[in-house]
């Protein structure tokens, strides 16, 4: 039985009418302080170590629950790399089952992307050297273990990955990590009475929990200086989409999406964030008034009582994050830049048109289930294609090794925050994409395109893509 559009909207929170310990601010009232993952930055050729291991974490402030993590903590450190560098990365699998890892948004050849061909058995390392040759972007690294991606990400194998370049260094945007520039990783879970995550693969559709977490805790707050605050938003949920807004109706100023800056800041009162999508926003805190980001209405009393006896997909609390300004307004504050990037001239013609239909009641893409040994799509590096992606059941669509522009959504203009290059897009009907093939892949190291609902991808809504190197 497939998840109906109405049920999905109710479950997703879209129906608005209805290596070190993380940094923390001082506790305030019943809200926990926002945990800020430690920063792991590439410097002078030194390798970056990411150890996948069992850990313990307190989601609700009580006893710690057994989880998976990276470098000893739930989720992982925020990795920062710089365009032009060659970064040596050492993944170490200290878990009891095979795992593969990838960095969504990092544009690398298929040999360096991870996935099935780079499966790490227990006790095994993988040490790729990654040439960073792309524009600044907020990416994320996570498990993409074949047929086990959903439980592995749910268990805690995920973290934020930031690419900086000369443009990002010189723009007048907040860039002090953990001070005015924060990673915000949103997930939903189902916790038992002891705060231990529960996970059962749903019979159809994706997994929805009843507890929304940000950086591993519920409804946190963070103290910020008066002025502009930069939030790097990542939806690391298995299937839930969020519609974010401010409790006082102030605006989000969107400056970047999945693969980098927008040409200019876009101002919105509501902000969508599908699974796997990233958005960078600026929030004006200069007036000194506290504000919360919310994801719709929380469960009512009857819904909460019902949730005591059966699993619920309605969020108990929809407060994402509370921003609490402190201190005095600086004597000089930067204005929001009018432009972020120079106008880009896109060269080349569309060489091919494709239609991709994501499975609904049955998983698969264009009626075919993912097969590790089959190439489903062949393209040429350095070319453009026009893809129409269709889904009857709302979900995101993600593709490795490419960047795309959203041209239309169900025949209409896309959301303003979807300007700029992306690798993940929300599909509810038909979405038209202009796809550029940045990197090559190979028969034994193909790129994967898939549903962004992790359970659907695990059940076969994925395909392998061979991108032949440019001459």
From Swiss-Prot:
Predicted to be exported by the Tat system. The position of the signal peptide cleavage has not been experimentally proven. GO terms for molecular function: copper ion binding; oxidoreductase activity. GO terms for biological process: FtsZ-dependent cytokinesis. Residues 1-27 form the signal peptide. PROSITE patterns: TAT. Coiled coil: none annotated. InterPro entries: Cu-oxidase-like_N, Cu-oxidase_C, Cu-oxidase_fam, Cupredoxin, FtsP, TAT_signal, TAT_signal_bac_arc. It holds the Pfam family TAT_signal. Belongs to the FtsP family. PANTHER family: BILIRUBIN OXIDASE, CUPREDOXIN SUPERFAMILY PROTEIN. This is Cell division protein FtsP. It comes from Rahnella sp. (strain Y9602). The gene is ftsP.
